[in-house]
């Protein structure tokens, strides 16, 4: 158990005692009869490659710019070692997708180790696991090749291996190595690949698509970093929306996320210029997203491109017959995902290593089509995609990318959902508390993105406001089916959006859990299947609540959006004991970051007297009482 920190002179011990003190204040009485059903997949994740959350983040490949991808290749992250220079070679393509390779020019009088280094994504996290590296090589050479992980400033070696390899000038050949490592104290580590300079003197060698992986989550090939995957698994989310987000849209039709260019061997994926200022390798592609869902037990929510690029980029929005090739492309993607091996695209999936179809039940058509000039044409575009997809796959749940009526068909198709996004101030989120009370119950809602914004790090005021917003939609989780905080992940060294749920650097174990992360974890891990009626002698504000049950277990979620302690009595007939989890700080501006961890949850066991729990909730607090 971690106690509260930095609480304006109130000791952690006295505060914890105050949580279970006898007090008389707001009375909450939970009905054990009846109730409304609550969505079993209410809490989950929205992911797109922003803030280097994919490349350089949860995706396990650690080398930056591994294949010199793109129409303007460069040597970012690469440097030469020893008596040699490196250059981009566009005349020695590895594949049609990787048209440029690194040419290593070795001096005539070279001796010792010569080769190249890669600095990773602002470092390489060497965690002490077994590492694996692969690379393609072309050129006349027969001799030793050494792969090392070495301190950038210290020269300390954290792992190495040497193999003997023979290559020719005619074709690329692939080499692969595995080697043990010792844990590095930080991320200031270089990947180094060298050959014997005395053997290769005066020659040149080409290297193509180099990779470096440590241990991956559940040992999945081309998989996720376990440190970040474990943090997500701790949240016990239920779904994953991918691949975006703005990064699905792209800046034009040509620049959109193309599913068929994210599958197969890494060196057959050209990558693309992402919409968040950096190139995406697409090593984290369609297969990897579905394996992510399998390995973390998540329901996949697939976003598909719908004829609209970010801010009406290129010649978008497309309408009428211009949509036909893109509708066909989505149908091909769905056949790839859902078709058996007798179908053209199902057979292609099997050839790429996935024999059985994936379990896809939900598809979202577009992203935020209410913005950037997309609204006026969205009803037409949504209908065109909906009709084609529904005709081919009538069991799929199809989700519109907005909930704004002006952008939607006059009558939504039966069974379709809408997507509601809300980035706001703390007061703005609290003001949305009862928004979902008055929804049309015939159209289910997906809250695809929400959070407090316009701040560097989530703080207590914002996180409590998010909890109020979450209590509001959980009270209505008969119609609000799913909700996801966004953005999810943030490499501290390269950030395009703040605040974010989880921060990290490349130092092993350097993961920063925000106050908002703990709110998400507390709410997601304590879920009932039925929302219970709660009667009170007080109105909502500054205290907010929702109660649910699953069998004999009851969950009361509370948020105190104010500077005063709230004394509570919570009555749940038939219960006798409970676990009280509280996240609080008397300073509404308190936050966790890469330099400080001020606020973490505290847990205590509480006893009921005749089914009634009595405790106090501190200022700026979020709490969950799990009782049985």
Curated annotation (Swiss-Prot):
Gene Ontology molecular functions: alpha-L-arabinofuranosidase activity
Subcellular location: Secreted
Signal peptide coordinates: 1-25
Nucleus as UniProt keyword: no
InterPro entries with a match to the protein in the record: Alpha-L-AF_C (IPR010720), ASD1_cat (IPR055235), Glyco_hydro_b (IPR013780), Glycoside_hydrolase_SF (IPR017853), Glycosyl_Hydrolase_51 (IPR051563)
Glycosylation site positions: 36, 51, 74, 152, 171, 260, 359, 440, 493, 610
Membrane-traversing stretches: none
Pathway: Glycan metabolism; L-arabinan degradation
SUPFAM superfamilies: (Trans)glycosidases, Glycosyl hydrolase domain
UniProt catalytic activity: Hydrolysis of terminal non-reducing alpha-L-arabinofuranoside residues in alpha-L-arabinosides
Record EC number: 3.2.1.55
Gene3D superfamilies found in the cross-reference section: Glycosidases, Golgi alpha-mannosidase II
Coiled-coil residue spans: none
Recorded family membership: Belongs to the glycosyl hydrolase 51 family.
Protein name: Probable alpha-L-arabinofuranosidase A
Organism in which the protein naturally occurs: Aspergillus niger (strain ATCC MYA-4892 / CBS 513.88 / FGSC A1513)
